[in-house]
Amino acid sequence: MATPSLDSARAADAAIEKAPDLLPEALPGRRPSLVGLTRDALKAQLIGMGVPERESRMRAGQVWHWVNFRGASDFAEMTNVGKALKAQLAEHFTLERPEVASRQVSRDGTRKWLLRMAPTNRQEHNRGAEIECVYIPGPDRGTLCVSSQVGCTLTCSFCHTGTQRLVRNLSAAEIVQQLVTARDELGDWPGQMPSRDAGGSGEVGRLVTNIVFMGMGEPLYNLDAVVDAVGVMSDQEGLGLSRRRITVSTSGVVPQIPRLGEQANAMLAISLHAVRDDLRDELVPLNRKYPIAELLAACRAYPGLSNARRITFEYVMLKGVNDSDADARELVRLLKGIPAKINLIPFNPWPGSRYECSDWDRIERFSEIVFNAGYASPVRTPRGRDILAACGQLKSETEKLRARARLMQEEGIGVESFYAGADD
């Protein structure tokens, strides 16, 4: 396999260093949404609106219940809130969710939503940034894969999202709104009729039982928002998910790993994908900054690590690249002493990717070596491949359209009609 050029390596390193603190700001004159706010932020908004501070905790608790437990989409639904206060709330705020710009359902039942966030500046032609969110139904759980950034800086060579430039971080509210929108789409609120064929099963009848931060972006480059979002999602008087059912996946931003454990108390997943630094430098350029030894040292010190709170190591199976018996044995050696599970991920192809998925018998042999060494080594069943919703395939539809338009321009093909029909 070709080694990346010096220029591309430098570009990747520059992208890693960037990690910009880009957060959305509401357009002037636009009423903010209360959906997804933390308790403290909600209380502050009500006080700012004029609710007396001595009443603010009670009023915030009422609104919290309707927004995060009942899934209210209109202030009129809040039956235990006085008429005057409801009118005041409606004057100052909304209960808007992101716009669902498109819906796709895979043959296997996986659902992918393209979500358009509220516009944050006029340079975006009044179209908010777009992210993808995926729901994966299973026999004993329903997993929602959420995004933490619009695009990504990391340029991992096997990942489609890495080909989309970073636009900005998502706010904590925008991360939570992905769960709220999924529950809207699935009919997953108390008293609602679940969407037909939504699949899933689990505690208190919820369709969405698990959250994985494995969508667009590197969560630990937006850790403040991720910590707040986990807090809102796991509040037992609201959205009610267990923190043990919330997993945050990182490519290895080593300095932030302890804080994730201390403040979010979420389960940790590591996108490892290689057992040698030279190969991981190519697959996951962040490795040049935080090599494997440093990453695994941080894993061994992860707060709360135990056999009951294992770290998941994700390992994408690339034909002829990282799938040999020797790779499997070295993986076992590296992880010695870390309570861990190794998820083997068949590579999911995407347009323009230069890798192939390992043959199935090679994946099974790799799994057998790891399993015989005492580690659970499930092979992740590819879900949603036909709608580009599988691991490593996410990239917002608008970005795909722009890329296609650039190609058309380079080839001398007019793009005016192309963009005109993009929203049809």
UniProtKB/Swiss-Prot annotation:
Disulfide bonds join 145-391. It comes from the Bacteria. Belongs to the radical SAM superfamily. RlmN family. This is Dual-specificity RNA methyltransferase RlmN. GO terms for biological process: rRNA base methylation; tRNA methylation. Residues 138-388 form the Radical SAM core domain. InterPro entries: Aldolase_TIM (IPR013785), Methyltransferase_A (IPR040072), RlmN_N (IPR048641), RNA_MTrfase_RlmN (IPR027492), rRNA_lsu_MTrfase_RlmN/Cfr (IPR004383), rSAM (IPR007197). One of its GO terms (molecular function) is metal ion binding. Gene3D superfamilies: 1.10.150.530, Aldolase class I. The gene is rlmN. It is found in: Cytoplasm. GO terms for cellular component: cytoplasm. Reaction proceeds by a ping-pong mechanism involving intermediate methylation of a conserved cysteine residue. Specifically methylates position 2 of adenine 2503 in 23S rRNA and position 2 of adenine 37 in tRNAs. m2A2503 modification seems to play a crucial role in the proofreading step occurring at the peptidyl transferase center and thus would serve to optimize ribosomal fidelity. Binds 1 [4Fe-4S] cluster. The cluster is coordinated with 3 cysteines and an exchangeable S-adenosyl-L-methionine. HAMAP family: RNA_methyltr_RlmN. Its main location: cytoplasm. The keyword Methyltransferase applies. S-adenosyl-L-methionine binds at residues 217-218, 249, 271-273, 348. Pfam families: Radical_SAM, RlmN_N. Coiled coil: none annotated. It catalyses: adenosine(2503) in 23S rRNA + 2 reduced [2Fe-2S]-[ferredoxin] + 2 S-adenosyl-L-methionine = 2-methyladenosine(2503) in 23S rRNA + 5'-deoxyadenosine + L-methionine + 2 oxidized [2Fe-2S]-[ferredoxin] + S-adenosyl-L-homocysteine; adenosine(37) in tRNA + 2 reduced [2Fe-2S]-[ferredoxin] + 2 S-adenosyl-L-methionine = 2-methyladenosine(37) in tRNA + 5'-deoxyadenosine + L-methionine + 2 oxidized [2Fe-2S]-[ferredoxin] + S-adenosyl-L-homocysteine. It comes from Methylobacterium radiotolerans (strain ATCC 27329 / DSM 1819 / JCM 2831 / NBRC 15690 / NCIMB 10815 / 0-1). The active site is at residues 132, 391.
